[in-house]
Amino acid sequence: MSEKLRTILDLLSCPDDGRPLRLDREQLVCSGCGRGFPLHEDFAEILPRHAARLPASASADYRGAYRSLFERPYQKDDTCLAWGAEEGATPSWIRKRQRQVAAMRPLVTEGIEAAASVLCDIAAGAGHYTFAYAPQFRFVLHCDLSVENLNYARRKARERHLENIFFLRIDYFQPPFRRSLDRILCLDTLIRGEAHDAMLLKSIADSLQTSGTAVIDFHNWWHNPFRRLGLLPENFHSNKSYRRSETEILLAETAFGSATVFPFVQEFNPGSRLDRICSRMVPSTRIVYRVRGGPRAPAESAPFSRQHRR
């Protein structure tokens, strides 16, 4: 692992001071503050010294869960399940996830050089996307804060003989990247409210190279407005769904160079005849954007382009 890690070392930096990391025996060491970050077989823990200060609007439940995940020491466990693991999901849920993996693939892989490109999933969870896209990239950075998610994903990657994935335990509010990444993925994560999601978007923007791209998504409020209005039982609980105008405001306040929207309807197989006919009449399940890095002041407005307006 240590020698293999050298190939991506120039992508990593200290989450505290942003200085480069160097490999020193069985740990990574910051060239500035001198902090050491442990290596465990096939993954590295690169957490900041302190947890992030969450916005006042964050729920007590989320605050507690975040703090618990951040403070939990690593312990290897070959039996745990990640959130969203197929072993604990319904067939219907799995089909929807597989459709999204298929729909996102061209957005993630367009223009890559398979022998050189690196994909970073900044909140990778059970690995649905990283495992599917790994064969098309030289390396994949599978990042998460949860010990359970990382243990599960490492186990599944070994079972599938995927050897080009690096597992990194990070805090996505303070990631160990400084304008070093060419391709970032962040799906099913921008759901905790505007303040939380703005913090995460800034982290993504600060991690992207000027020429890099990120694929992100928001849950669409209009996909099921009756639930959002309380006329049907709510199945999204305290999480946040967005209207298109709200997502554009969030992105305009973040230092991205441009943003292109790709609405996605998860009820139909991507590219199928039913998808081509019905997806224009059904509000999109997710509002997906491909955003580009760029040296732009946060107060400026990102230029938007659209595939469809829904």
Model-derived regions, located:
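N-terminal auxiliary segments of SAM/dcSAM-dependent transferases
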Residues: 2-68
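Conserved class I S-adenosyl-L-methionine
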Residues: 47-113
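Class I SAM-dependent methyltransferase SAM/SAH-binding core
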Residues: 120, 126-173
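A conserved beta-strand element that flanks and buttresses the S-adenosyl-L-methionine
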Residues: 185-186
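A short, conserved alpha-helix within the catalytic core of class I
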Residues: 192-203
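Short, glycine-/aromatic-enriched active-site segment of Class I SAM-dependent methyltransferases
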Residues: 217-238
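Short alpha-helix
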Residues: 239-255
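Conserved catalytic loop of SAM-dependent methyltransferase domains
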Residues: 259-288, 292
